């Protein structure tokens, strides 16, 4: 592929991300600063080391089908600059609810689900001195989670993020139990990190609500479901919020805080302040919307990338190379709004793919059983 063709594809891929970013800001879902926080602290870092095909190959194309299938018809299809309002990045300050000192209020944290994300959430909170109550359905799963937490802590020590002495100290801050009620009875914050099954999550939230103290904030790490979907079974919808971590949670600083229709500004501020105090970079999603910020941007990129492959302009490997060695590192450093020109990007809107159906290239992978790395 020659340089001119590569640059043309790169600009279109960036325009797809930019178009959806602007649409989110215009809709009041978040501000420009929130978009760039998500990019620089999570998905942009992924793009800088692996393009969209490499990333989704690791996740699994069957899961991509679920995520993209729900979003492909919802992401922006604006074809001209006149259809959007350019956000003023300089005025983007993030969520500005009532300020609270959250560090002293979330000392005891229950993590429900000790799997891939749950154990990472637990170990990061433990490193920062929180007393963590890790819960799952079997002692085997909990034992395995502690083993993986130890590995994660050693990895942090190996790169100088923590000292060797902090490994064992952090582990002493993690208690395990298969009794859900016991795990949440003293919790200031409960983070549900179970499988992406709404009925399961509702059952967990109903039990948590009946067992946790009335002051507890109840959160879900779901990347799919919004707070009203699981919080509706509780008697404290004002204290229910989404806290969407990125994998691996102890290495990527970004999180998305998703507010439900009843979530109080005090709770959002508590969560935001607490996570900022331990070094996380929260972006507040102010309106319930499918895919939040992160998945919508990733699907916008993937749709344009797959369209480019289907048209024969580039291979998947070439697309990954363009992202990984082109704009990926730039986006990881300064985000989308600090990286691109509105006039340059908006000129490309009319050229972008606007299909509302899943690309054939994805459907072919699913049909052939090519599900990626499992």
Q: What do the PLM-derived regions correspond to, one by one?
A:
Residues 1-8, 16, 22-114, 123-130, ...:
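NAD(P)-dependent Rossmann-like dehydrogenase/reductase catalytic/cofactor-binding core
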Residues 112, 177, 193, 220-222, ...:
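Structural motif
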Residues 130, 135-162:
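Glycine-rich phosphate-binding loop and adjoining beta1-alpha1-beta2 segment
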């Amino acid at each position: 592929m020659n340089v001119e063709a590569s640059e043309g594809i790169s600009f279109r891929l960036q325009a797809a991300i930019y178009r959806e970013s602007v649409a989110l800001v215009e809709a009041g879902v978040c501000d420009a600063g929130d978009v760039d926080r998500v990019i620089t602290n999570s998905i942009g870092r992924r793009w800088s080391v692996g393009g969209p095909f490499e990333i989704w190959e690791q996740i699994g194309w069957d899961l991509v089908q679920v995520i993209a299938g729900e979003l492909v018809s919802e992401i922006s299809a604006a074809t001209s600059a006149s259809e959007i309002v350019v956000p003023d990045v300089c005025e983007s300050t993030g969520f500005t609810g009532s300020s609270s000192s959250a560090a002293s209020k979330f000392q005891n944290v229950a993590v429900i689900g000790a799997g891939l994300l749950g154990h990472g959430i637990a170990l990061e909170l433990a490193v920062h001195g929180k007393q963590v109550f890790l819960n799952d359905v079997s002692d085997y799963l909990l034992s395995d989670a502690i083993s993986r937490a130890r590995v994660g802590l050693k990895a942090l020590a190996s790169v100088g993020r923590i000292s060797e002495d902090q490994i064992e100290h952090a582990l002493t801050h993690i208690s395990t139990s298969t009794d859900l009620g016991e795990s949440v009875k003293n919790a200031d914050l409960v983070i549900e990190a179970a499988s992406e099954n709404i009925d399961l999550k509702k059952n967990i939230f109903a039990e948590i609500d009946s067992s946790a103290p009335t002051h507890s904030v109840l959160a879900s790490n779901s990347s799919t479901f919004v707070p009203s979907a699981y919080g509706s079974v509780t008697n404290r919808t004002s204290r229910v919020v989404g806290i969407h971590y990125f994998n691996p949670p102890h290495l990527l600083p970004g999180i998305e805080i998703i507010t439900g229709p009843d979530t109080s500004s005090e709770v959002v501020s508590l969560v935001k302040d607490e996570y900022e105090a331990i070094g996380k970079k929260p972006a507040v999603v102010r309106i319930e919307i499918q895919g939040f910020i992160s998945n919508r941007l990733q699907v916008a990129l993937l749709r344009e990338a797959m369209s480019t492959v289907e048209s024969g302009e580039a291979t998947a490997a070439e697309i990954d190379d363009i992202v990984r060695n082109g704009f990926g590192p730039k986006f990881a450093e300064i985000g989308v709004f600090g990286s691109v020109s509105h006039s340059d990007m908006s000129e490309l809107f009319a050229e972008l793919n606007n299909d509302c159906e899943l690309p054939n290239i994805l459907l072919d992978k699913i049909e052939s059983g090519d599900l990626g790395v499992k």
